[in-house]
């Protein structure tokens, strides 16, 4: 995770107390503080994803690019990871294949097929039975809750 501080260090500069605090804060945010002494290779797939996110957070990014950040995570950690990312207060561009999670945690969505944008907008506008048919070739029914959760039934 300390490698996330590398862009902020000059050649041969040692990490500062602030660097260590930022790394510890990042580990705390992703729930990996208790495992910080373990080798990366000994971690599960989900734990590795959380460590990678912690490394990115240690960089203090203004924009965070995430490719399937919830892949291999248990449901609890999927929800926690996306809630954390949403609460960071920075711009995030994420690729998610779980449409229901994307709707719940995204302010704006792009649905793509073959590299082309098929639908875009706030989740309620972009995710429709018609757009899911166009992108995934499935029939569906969508019910929206007041807190922007999409309940998708595939028919």
Language model segments and positions:
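Conserved ABC ATPase signature
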Residues: 13-14, 39-43, 47
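A short, proline-enriched helix->beta-strand linker immediately N-terminal to the Walker B motif
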Residues: 58-62
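ABC ATPase nucleotide-binding domains
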Residues: 129-155
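Short, glycine/charged-rich "phosphate-handling" switch motifs in NTP-dependent
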Residues: 108, 120
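Conserved ABC ATPase "signature" region
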Residues: 17-35
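Catalytic Walker B motif of ABC-type/P-loop ATPase nucleotide-binding domains
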Residues: 64-68, 73
